[in-house]
Structures are given as structure tokens and as C-alpha cells.
């Protein structure tokens, strides 16, 4: 098959289909014998049945071409989420042997995550592999027999957390040292942690968003500049590992209590904000609310329940940090009033939010959460996504006013006007005009 040239003069109706594009780069190319994509008739993917009644019938996720993975892979995309490119760089620069066999000795979960019925339902969990923490052990024989690489997509561990705000809470008497959750007078915390990489079951994801699987595949293929041709050429493969950030679960108290409906649960679902969470920017309430959420989660654990904080990598409402900083510039140069808060984002990004909270509750169902006694979030989008997935929320806890930095009143008042929960006043559009952030030069 000869190469097909598509120029700017080629009519749109004459653009070749994916299958017409050459599948093997010729020896005249800098890269020899590179297979660009695969087709159902050329492959024998290892069976994978999402939502199967047992792990044996479910099967492992195979998402690499190494060994016999080219013919037998049953997932599109690559492991490690947004870090997959660094893995490729390590291989390309000869720092990593592509045939490296991971030794998972002693890397098994540091605590048992109670198995849930939701793990075996193809609608309850569609954005993560519920068996991702067990795959190297459940499917070791499959890996050997089929000569394919099987990698975990979840890791479960324990740690000690040190935060200045928790030390302050101990010193001021808001938290007590109990030796179990709060370890010492420095406010060090015992915490159980779970890291999760995204794994999408495409039919389920499409259903959550109210689109067809074909529409979803087309958008994912075209809007990523054709990054994953198999989204188009492999309709038989239903699982996709997207190149996006994952999430981390932080559990305070006994992990078994999280799924116990007789125990109270305090929960904060937090979306990443590097500028505030890590570097203390006061233009938003992100770090103050996160620290308040952790403190309240610890208190619930000390009261005999459990506390959970889920941290999603969705920087800048999933618009990214570059877009977020451009919006900051536009806000500060344009007066930075609360009535224009969302409009400035829409002018630059075309949309105010791309976090798509519909997928967020999956990790809650994976943990076995059946109710939330205290929801440490004001977000109507998070609330609605959780409730829509059948998890009731008993009480919603807004951030205390004294924790809101002055420059972030623009953000919080605009969000309350748009539907965020509050026990206080909801400003109208005219009142929002009087809520103004400081300028770059107005720092005292």
C-alpha cells in the first residue's frame, strides 16, 4: 500500500480513513517496521469482561505491546496515566529495558481493602480497575502462560502525614493526641493511602455522559490529534487507559470502617490546585478547605468513625495550570469582580469547568461507601454526582468564613451564586459586582 498524502487542498470528503493509512512505516523512514495500529482480524486479545461475576472470568488488563502484547493486548492507551511519556523516554534513551520484568515482591497492599459487590458491576465502576491493586498476584499465571506484561493500576500503602495546620490544631486544642490517629504533639497523623491510575470502561463512561460509545471514541481520537488510532480501529476493545492524572485516597482511622454503614464517615473530595495546596496562593480557598477537610476527617476517626480525603489530579478545574494562570491575568487586569469570575474562564477556555464529576464517585463505590455523614464540600457538582450514583449525603459542611482568605472572596461568592452550598447569604448578580479582589500591586 502506498503512502497517501493529505494536503491543505484535499477536500474534506477525500481525507482517507484510518484503515487506508499505511500500517507499517517503510525502511526509508527513520523508524523501521513500526505498526501504527491494529485491527480485530489481526489480533487475539486476552478475554476481558468488565463487570464479570468473578476475577477469573473478568481477566487482566493488558495495555503494552511488549512480549506478545501487540497481538494480545485488550486495552487501548498506556499505563501510568500522564507519566506514560516519561516511561517511553526512558526506553527511547536506553535507560530502561522495554522487556524489564517487574519484581513485585513485598509490594502487595499494606492493608486489605474489603471486597465490594460494586467491583463486579459494569455500571457502578467505569473509571478505574477495581482489581488494579491485585492484578500482579491474581493474574501471574496468565502473564507467564500468555507471555504478556500485566501491571497494577492501584497501590495501597501506609504513611505518616506531617502538616503545619495539624500541629497548629493540636497546639490550640482542636485536635487531641490519641497515639493512634494523631500520633504526637507535633500533629503527625497515621494515614492509609491508595494511589489510583485511570482505567476507563468506554461503554460505561459513554453512558455516564449520555453519549454513544462511538461519539466518545471519535472525540477522544480527534481531539487528541489522533493520539490513539485504536479508539477507531478497535471497537472490540472496550477499555482505555487515558493519559490523564489519577487520584489518591487518604484514610484516617480504621480502613474497615469506611464501608461500615454503622460508622460515621466524614469525606472531602478535593481537586488539585498546586498554587494553593502546595505553594499557599491566597486567590482561592483550596488549601484552607483541604486542611479543614483533613482536620474534620481526623476528628471523625477519633470519634470512632472514619475520615476520607480523595485528591484528584484535575488542576485548574481540569483546564490545566497554563489556562488557569491566563485567567488570573485576565481577572487582575480586568478588575477581578465576582460577577465576572466564571466569564473570564469561559472567554479563554470556552467552558468554565472540565472536571466531569460524573466519574468521581467510582472510587467511593470501590471503597464501599454507602452513605456520607459529613460532606466537607460546597460543590453542587460533586454533591449531585455522588447522590446520582445512589450514595446519600446526610450533612454538607461549608468552609468556615474565618478560613476564607480575603482575595478568595471573589471565587467563593461567585461559586455560591452559581449553586455552591452555603448556610449564609447568596449574593445576586448586582451584589457580586461589589466583591473585588486586590490588584497585583495592592499587597499589604
Curated annotation (Swiss-Prot):
Q: What class of enzyme is it?
A: hydrolase
Q: Which InterPro entries match?
A: GTP_CH_N, GTP_cyclohydro_II, RibA, RibA-like_sf
**CDD domains, per database record:** GTP_cyclohydro2
Q: Name one GO cellular component term.
A: nucleus
Q: Say yes or no: keyword GTP-binding present.
A: yes
Residues annotated for Zn(2+) binding in this entry: 273, 284, 286
**What does UniProt list as catalytic?**
353, 355
Q: Primary place of residence?
A: cytoplasm
Q: Which Pfam families match?
A: GTP_CH_N, GTP_cyclohydro2
Q: What is this protein called?
A: Putative GTP cyclohydrolase URC1
